Structures are given as C-alpha cells and as structure tokens.
Amino acid sequence: GLLHEKIISDRRVTVFERTNIKNLSGDSLAQTFDIVVVDLSFISLRTVMKNILSLANSDASIVMLIKPQFEATKLEASKSKGVIVDREIWIRTITEVLLSASEHGGNAQDIIVSPVPGKAGNKEFLLLISKQFPSQDLRLSELV
C-alpha cells in the first residue's frame, strides 16, 4: 500500500487498501464513518458513488481524488496515452462526478487541483463532498 505507517497504525483509521469498493457499503460493514477518503485507480468514481456515499455518516466529510484519466471515455484516454490535458475533458469529467454525487445525496463543497500530479503527470482534483450542507458553486471554469 501507499499509506504512511503513522496513518495505518492510528486506531481512529480503518484502512481498506486493495479492497474492491464494489463489495463495500455502510450496510455490509454495519457501520459508517465520519471521514471518507477515496483514491481509486482504474475505475470511475461514478460507478461506485452509491457505495462511497453509503460509507459516510450524515455529517461526514468525504474527500475524493478525481482522476480524469479514469473518468474520461476509453477513446479520450487512449488518444492521449492516458494523460488528459484537455481542459474541456477535465471540466466535463468533474461535472459528471459532481452529478453522480448529487444523485446519491452528496453535495459539493469545494474542489482544488491536487498539489501532487498523477504518476504520468495527469492533473487530478481533490473534491470535498458533504451530505449535510447544500452544494456550493465550485466555479470549475476558474479552477482549470
């Protein structure tokens, strides 16, 4: 895994590295969490949004790393050899993740460009979601 030992050993942290999120839900675990942090690879957040949000308490903070290379179409990703540099694709894929979150009771609070680029140099985005507070205008056109 990639988590620092200090995080892994913290008794307040439940780690689900190398776990298929499709098999997880608040119901299957019989618990939900105050903070949910999501960093997925090779899968769209949209396909598992219901699972992600089901893991969060009603007043939880949910932080998702949006990786446009996994949200874009296969054609878009293959055209650019997996490195998405098109601003329109960034905005569209972020918007699609936001809509998916909204469909499952998640409300966008904030978004930033990740200070750490993806391995191949992809621009990635950290999204803060809440179930408790109303959605905020993220001004995506100013972000990218």
How does the language model describe each region?
Residues P68-V85:
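Short, glycine-/aromatic-enriched active-site segment of Class I SAM-dependent methyltransferases
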Residues G1-T47:
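S-adenosyl-L-methionine
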Residues K123, S130-V144:
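Flexible, glycine-/basic-rich loop-and-beta segments that form/coincide
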Residues R46-V63:
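A short glycine-rich, Lys/Arg-flanked "PGG" loop and its adjoining helix->strand segment in the class I
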Residues W90-H104:
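Short alpha-helix
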Residues L3, K67, G121:
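Residue-level signal for inorganic ion chemistry
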Residues G106-P115:
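Conserved S-adenosyl-L-methionine
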Residues I21-K22, P68-A72, P115-V116:
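Short "lid" loop at the C-terminus of a central beta-strand within the Rossmann-like core
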